[in-house]
């Protein structure tokens, strides 16, 4: 329940930024960005001020094109009878990827992966997600695509690791506002699940607009 509610909020924010980027007349060249794992901070750990991200260090990826398309593994993005499929032109894979953003002219594919574990499992899940797409990234690169993976974690009790802000900034998303929304969604979902823990007729539903 929490996963898809949080993912939908992210997807709507991505759609807004894509619409804005596609309205730009002239794309800019965006250099390769540093991997995110170097900025992962555990719950309760202080953030080193020297590692704070500036706009100069993290230009957003959507500057590189103006023909972006996105899709997410959510029913809100499916028409009746359609299936969610990762673009075969990038790579062939059976992996279930939460979402992707693609520009065919710039040959850039950005995959987005969300996980909503218990806070004590955040570090393990982050490492797992980093390794999960190594083969896919290699194949995409061999096929002539620039491949970027963006990983977002939101803990079941609402903790959001510090690197998530940088991740969202890479897509030109107003990180603070969206993170506050994701925190509230995760907490609400956990509360709903808790109060329905003995309800055998419980069904999930959306806590954000469709």
PLM-predicted stretches and their roles:
Residues 5-7, 126-135:
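Well-ordered, non-membrane alpha-helical segments in soluble/globular domains
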Residues 1-14, 109:
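Short Cys/His-based metal-binding microdomains
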Residues 147-210:
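Domain-level recognition of nuclease-like catalytic cores that cleave nucleotide substrates
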Residues 9, 22-111, 127:
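Active-site metal-binding core of divalent-cation-utilizing nuclease and nuclease-like domains
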Residues 14, 130-144:
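Metal-dependent nuclease catalytic cores in nucleic-acid-processing enzymes
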Residues 96, 108-128, 154-156:
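Short beta-strand-loop-alpha-helix junction that forms the active-site gateway
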